Regions:
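Short acidic/polar hinge/loop motifs at secondary-structure boundaries
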Residues: 105-132
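Face-selective signature of the C-terminal outer-membrane beta-barrel domain
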Residues: 231-249, 266-398, 454-460, 497, ...
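Outer-membrane beta-barrel signature, preferentially recognizing the C-terminal barrel domain
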Residues: 259-282, 312-315, 383-384, 398, ...
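Periplasmic-side early beta-strands and strand-to-turn transitions of outer-membrane beta-barrels
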Residues: 136-137, 149, 155-159, 163-167, ...
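N-terminal periplasmic "start-of-domain" segments of outer-membrane beta-barrel proteins
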Residues: 28-59, 87, 95
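Gram-negative outer-membrane beta-barrel transporters
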Residues: 329, 333, 367-370, 460-464, ...
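Outer-membrane beta-barrel "beta-signal"
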Residues: 446-448, 608-621
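Extracytoplasmic beta-strand/coil segments of soluble accessory domains associated
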Residues: 65-105, 109
Length: 621
């Protein structure tokens, strides 16, 4: 763990780096902004979800992937238990097609192409916004399947309000968090720390094809994190907002060779950091300017046989300038530019270890009576592969006060990673500097309703991805643009109150087809065709009861869909309860995987069985 949490002290001493949140008197930050990059949007077209702090605590979730799995169109695969490598898929795309932001700053590895969502501490999160569908016209590369934006905890009521939690559970699992939030006048802040540890489970199952590789041990996980977020609004309307989040983690994993002679005592030490700052001001009554700067790090050292084995570090710096022109309440024109540099460091010698990208975007949003329009264009220029243009068009029509019809079209792309382009050549693997960006084209239509009894929505979509980058061949294996995928799906959701119980359910039907010549018509790897989620909650005075059901159909671990790669469908049931001692104190208990179901999301990797967790929470009023 090479970074120190003492960085908080540096930030506390640099108020000039604390920059801006969108907002009207510091309130606009509570609105969804990811779908449009604006605090005020006259239309609502994108298929999206919001997970609030209250929901995070009610669900008693232990990780970000656990929270995301209960959403329509989102699926999770994991290489073992808590803290192990985890992939999040939106609408059948890969984890490399999902853009992850923390307080507006892009995070993730520039070598692997994915973000370590399993290492983002839930105790430091205020809310999560999830947008399904392409958003490259606003954000550029990676936003093919969707965008996940995580916002750290922010200030609360006037004065200083401490909070803390402590938990314990199965497999010697322990967690704790503490912080203080508050505000005074036009300023606010939130400062917190959190830690967790677990002995975990045996990450990898016994394989008859490699019996000597079996390592029957518990693969544990430890994490220590801290965050700081603060903001101030001056009398002249200038708003400053800044945040810092850092998570240090240690994760054991199984990596013994087929002969059993090497790869023992394998573990990784990782560090994730995101620093963001924004300033917002209005030169004219209709013109809002937002300046943002950010820095993120994804660092990882791997060890085998108790010795250093490999290092893959990513450091990203970014800046953006956005201008929002508000023509009344019904029209917003946004013009902006983004600049980003990626730098990698590895024990391997890459041909290139840095690159930059410039992006220019324009977006128009308008509401005309019962009609809504959202249109965007973006031009990106990458240092290595050149220019790329993307666009989007959305339309909504209010059939009545309760029913809205939506339609959307968008193009997107994903730039090749440093591994794709420059992975050092060996007898087994080598990068390919000629590989091109992946491209996609997506269509969507939806209908949603809001009534006295609740709300519901139905969305149907098709996404076609071309020039998929696949590592193929042998001696060495190299990445090539060879594959095509066509993903069709229907997502449904209903939320209501039934017999006094709050009910929230969603059902996803998906046909994630591989359209390449070799595997035409097969399911994409590790994608399920059907998923169902059901949440039930009810309050009985001071006692709250809840239950969650998650079910998924079979999936295949190999692109060929051969029988020996089939992973059966499964269903999981969780129970939870909460007792309020008073308005400040709560006792919580959760029983996960009630029926102790054995299942896999990645072949040969185990998943946790039945587990019991207890938590006590305090929040000063």
């Amino acid at each position: 763990m090479r970074n120190s949490l003492s960085l908080a002290a540096v930030l506390l001493g640099l108020p000039s780096c604390v920059l801006a949140a969108h907002g009207d008197a510091l309130q606009l930050d509570q609105q969804l902004i990811t779908a449009s990059r604006t605090g005020h949007s006259p239309v609502s077209i994108a298929s999206s979800n919001l997970i609030t702090r209250d929901e995070i605590e009610r669900q008693q979730a232990g990780s970000v992937p656990e929270l995301l799995q209960r959403l329509a169109g989102v699926s999770i695969t994991s290489n073992g238990g808590r803290g192990k490598s985890t992939s999040v898929s939106i609408r059948g795309t890969s984890d490399k097609h999902v853009l992850v932001l923390i307080d507006g700053v892009r995070v993730g590895s520039a070598t692997s192409g994915s973000a370590a969502l399993q290492s983002i501490p839930v105790e430091q999160i205020e809310r999560i916004e999830i947008v399904r569908g392409p958003r490259s016209s606003l954000y550029g590369s990676e936003a093919m399947g969707g965008v996940i934006q995580i916002f750290t905890r922010r200030g609360g009521a006037e004065g200083f309000k401490p909070y803390f939690s402590a938990g314990a559970g199965s497999r010697s699992s322990y967690s704790g968090s503490a912080g203080v939030a508050g505000s005074h006048g036009n300023g606010w802040f939130n400062l917190g720390v959190a830690s967790e540890s677990t002995d975990g489970i045996n990450a990898r199952a016994y394989r008859s094809s490699a019996p000597n590789a079996f390592e029957p041990d518990a693969d544990g996980y430890r994490e220590l994190s801290g965050h700081l977020r603060a903001g101030y609004r001056f009398a002249n309307g200038l708003e400053l907002d800044g945040s810092w989040l850092q998570s240090e983690n240690h994760s054991d994993f199984d990596s013994r060779s087929s002969s059993g002679a090497s790869g023992r005592d394998a573990y990784s030490d990782g560090s994730l950091q995101a620093i963001s700052g924004r300033a917002r001001f209005s030169p004219l009554v209709f013109w809002d300017v937002t300046l943002q700067a950010g820095h993120s790090e994804d660092l990882g050292d791997n060890f085998q046989d108790g010795r250093f084995y490999s290092r893959f570090d990513t450091r990203r710096d970014s800046a953006s300038w956005q201008n929002d022109f508000n023509f009344g309440e019904a029209q917003v024109l946004s013009l902006g530019m983004d600049y980003q540099t990626d730098r990698i460091d590895s024990d391997d010698d890459y041909a290139e270890d840095s690159r930059y990208n410039k992006g220019y975007f324009v977006q128009y949003q308008a509401a005309f009576g019962r009609h809504g329009v959202q249109a965007g264009l973006r031009h990106d220029k990458d240092e290595f592969f050149g220019s790329h243009d993307t666009g989007s068009l959305g339309y909504s029509f209010d059939l009545s006060d309760a029913l809205t019809l939506t339609a959307a079209y968008g193009t997107a792309y994903r730039a090749p990673t440093f591994n794709d382009l420059y992975y050092p050549a060996s007898n087994s693997t080598a990068g390919n500097p000629d590989v091109k960006p992946e491209e996609s084209e997506s269509y969507e239509i939806g209908l949603r309703g809001s009534h006295g009894w609740g709300e519901w929505s139905v969305n149907a979509y098709e996404n076609r991805i071309e020039d998929l980058i696949v590592w193929a061949g042998s001696s060495p294996m190299r990445p090539e643009n060879v594959d095509v995928a066509r993903i069709r799906g229907i997502e449904t959701r209903v939320a209501t109150v039934l017999a006094g119980w709050d009910l929230d359910a969603n059902l996803t039907f998906m046909d994630p087809q591989d359209r390449s010549k070799a595997n035409h018509g097969h399911l994409l790897q590790r994608r399920a065709k059907r998923q169902f989620n059901l949440d039930l909650d009810r309050q009985f005075g001071a006692i709250g009861l809840g239950a969650s059901l998650y079910a998924a159909s079979e999936r295949f671990d190999k692109a060929s869909n051969v029988e020996d790669s089939r992973m059966p469908g499964y269903a999981l049931v969780d129970l939870r309860s909460e007792y309020r001692l008073d308005e400040a104190w709560r006792l919580q208990v959760k029983l996960a995987n009630l029926f102790d179901r054995d299942y896999e999301t990645t072949q040969t990797y185990e998943q946790p069985g039945r587990a019991l967790y207890f938590t006590v929470r305090y929040q000063a009023l």
